[in-house]
Amino acid sequence: MKFQARVLTLYPEMFPGFLGYSLAGQALERGIWSLETVQIRDFALDKHHSVDDTPAGGGAGMVMRADVLAAALDSCPHDSTRLLMSPRGRPFNQAYARFLACESGVTLVCGRFEGVDERIIEARKLEEVSIGDYILSGGETAALVLLDAIVRLLPGVMGNEASGKCESFENGLLEHPQYTRPSIFEGRCIPPVLTSGHHKAIADWRQQQAELLTRQRRPELYALYDKNRQKT
């Protein structure tokens, strides 16, 4: 089944962007997934094609109108999860990417300005999703990031399906260090265990390094990993 991605945006020309290259681009050409963009401005209700207005109660900036967004959303089949890219949303992570990759598709709403009228979130049951604790100029960049994370997990996208299973976050840890030729670079050698041919020793070393890196760089992630490990 083809994964169907739909993006509601004021800037459809931003898509597929970098998703037209490498793994995602090849998968798009091969028909593993499809991408449709919907121009929100096409659903404006006045001759000026306005999609925003001043915030109720005053304040800086503009807010995207609920009626315009509703018309844009209602023009699309309600056949997939509907997400609003938002800095106040649920944190997007690898587990959620894997969950969405098992769905038939996803519909992404890209906000602009100061955000969207709260009533469209309630009325169309949009789930807010965030890719990090920072502010972007709009939801398009976040949507591209989210789709990249999802598409690479679709069956047939990665040449070696095992490639994704040892990456950061897949087992609750950051990924272990990687090495390749030359064996010596500016006096730095590949750890001998990796060239020993001893598969058990290599696996143990990689696990130890993953735990060490996670404990040093992401203590909150390691605490969760350790808690789950103790349960089992």
UniProtKB/Swiss-Prot annotation:
Top EC group: transferase
Keywords noted in UniProt: Cytoplasm, Methyltransferase, S-adenosyl-L-methionine, Transferase, tRNA processing
Keyword Cytoplasm in annotation: yes
Record's keyword annotation contains Protein biosynthesis: no
SUPFAM superfamilies according to UniProt: alpha/beta knot
Predominant localisation class: cytoplasm
GO biological process: tRNA N1-guanine methylation
UniProt catalytic activity: guanosine(37) in tRNA + S-adenosyl-L-methionine = N(1)-methylguanosine(37) in tRNA + S-adenosyl-L-homocysteine + H(+)
Compartments in which it is found: Cytoplasm
Protein residues bound to S-adenosyl-L-methionine: 111, 131-136
Origin: domain of life: Bacteria
This enzyme's EC code(s): 2.1.1.228
GO-annotated molecular function: tRNA (guanine(37)-N1)-methyltransferase activity
An example Gene Ontology CC term for this record: cytosol
UniProt record similarity statement: Belongs to the RNA methyltransferase TrmD family.
Function: Specifically methylates guanosine-37 in various tRNAs.
Subunit description: Homodimer.
Protein name: tRNA (guanine-N(1)-)-methyltransferase
